């Protein structure tokens, strides 16, 4: 059995090291093998303090560097305006945008996150970004932008490094959880656990986020019980029920394929 990588250890996601979801190969890279740009992206997307001697497994390299943008399925909602997930017509925040917008709004924005048209419109309306401003921030991505990003103090908010709105609101907007059992979750008999002690689905071993997106790296506040950002209103560890469906922006219903 291969040892976990430094990234998995620091993020407490050692159970995900060496998975073959996104690559058929297993192994390690030292961080000094990464380009300076990839190293910077990794630091910003994980919130970690890294050194060249640290290692990253091929799975975590895919998740946080190569496929990070593809895995962001919804608007990062920097202004806390969405009651449901916004997943349509998303715009990727690049390295230069992250520096510029983080400085302008004083909010943590990570390159690779995405904005919906509504949030983009708010940004364009709130900030006078004329052509001169854009030219000032675009050409120098290897110099001033990198220095500015390194100078920003980012706390690590978890696996997906989401901007954290006011306490409690993310869970309210991510899940529509009715008080009556069985309406949006499937209740399993009291003696039958659906999740194991690590929060994995017992029948498949899958680390499924409560938003029901199988590619999601975690979009909730860190669970007070286990620290995972994949637990919704209640910790998944040893849980005896799972969500049957959720409703996202636009009224679309996502059904849990594992609820049957």
From Swiss-Prot:
<feature type="modified residue" description="N-acetylmethionine">
    <location>
        <position position="1"/>
    </location>
</feature>
<dbReference type="InterPro" id="IPR029264">
    <property type="entry name" value="ARF7EP_C"/>
</dbReference>
<dbReference type="GO" id="GO:0043231">
    <property type="term" value="C:intracellular membrane-bounded organelle"/>
</dbReference>
<comment type="function">
    <text>Through its interaction with ARL14 and MYO1E, may connect MHC class II-containing cytoplasmic vesicles to the actin network and hence controls the movement of these vesicles along the actin cytoskeleton in dendritic cells.</text>
</comment>
<dbReference type="GO" id="GO:0005925">
    <property type="term" value="C:focal adhesion"/>
</dbReference>
<keyword id="KW-0832">Ubl conjugation</keyword>
<feature type="modified residue" description="Phosphoserine">
    <location>
        <position position="183"/>
    </location>
</feature>
<feature type="cross-link" description="Glycyl lysine isopeptide (Lys-Gly) (interchain with G-Cter in SUMO2)">
    <location>
        <position position="177"/>
    </location>
</feature>
<dbReference type="GO" id="GO:0005886">
    <property type="term" value="C:plasma membrane"/>
</dbReference>
<dbReference type="GO" id="GO:0005730">
    <property type="term" value="C:nucleolus"/>
</dbReference>
<comment type="subunit">
    <text>Interacts with ARL14 and MYO1E.</text>
</comment>
<keyword id="KW-0963">Cytoplasm</keyword>
<dbReference type="GO" id="GO:0005654">
    <property type="term" value="C:nucleoplasm"/>
</dbReference>
<dbReference type="GO" id="GO:0005829">
    <property type="term" value="C:cytosol"/>
</dbReference>
<dbReference type="Pfam" id="PF14949">
    <property type="entry name" value="ARF7EP_C"/>
</dbReference>
<keyword id="KW-1017">Isopeptide bond</keyword>
<protein>
    <recommendedName>
        <fullName>ARL14 effector protein</fullName>
    </recommendedName>
</protein>
<keyword id="KW-0007">Acetylation</keyword>
<keyword id="KW-0597">Phosphoprotein</keyword>
């Amino acid at each position: 059995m291969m040892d976990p990588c430094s990234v998995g250890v620091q993020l407490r996601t050692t159970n995900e090291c060496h998975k073959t979801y996104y690559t058929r190969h297993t192994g390690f890279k030292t961080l000094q093998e990464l380009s300076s740009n990839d190293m910077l992206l990794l630091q910003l997307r994980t919130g970690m303090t890294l050194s060249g001697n640290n290692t990253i497994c091929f799975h975590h390299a895919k998740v946080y560097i190569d496929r990070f943008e593809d895995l962001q399925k919804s608007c990062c909602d920097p202004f806390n305006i969405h009651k449901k997930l916004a997943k349509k017509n998303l715009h990727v925040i690049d390295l230069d945008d992250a520096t510029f917008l983080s400085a302008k709004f004083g909010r943590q924005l990570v390159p690779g996150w995405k904005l919906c048209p509504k949030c983009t419109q708010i940004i364009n309306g709130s900030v006078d970004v004329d052509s001169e401003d854009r030219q000032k921030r675009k050409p120098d991505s290897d110099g001033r932008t990198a220095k500015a990003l390194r100078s920003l103090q980012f706390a690590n908010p978890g696996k997906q490094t989401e901007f954290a709105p006011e306490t409690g609101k993310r869970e309210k907007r991510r899940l529509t959880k009715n008080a009556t059992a069985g309406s949006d979750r499937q209740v399993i008999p009291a003696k039958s656990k659906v999740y194991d002690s690590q929060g994995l689905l017992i029948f498949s071993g899958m680390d499924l986020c409560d938003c029901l997106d199988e590619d999601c790296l975690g979009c909730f506040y860190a669970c007070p019980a286990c620290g995972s950002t994949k637990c919704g209103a209640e910790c998944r560890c040893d849980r005896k029920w799972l969500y049957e469906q959720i409703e996202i922006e636009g009224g679309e219903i996502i059904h849990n394929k594992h609820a049957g």
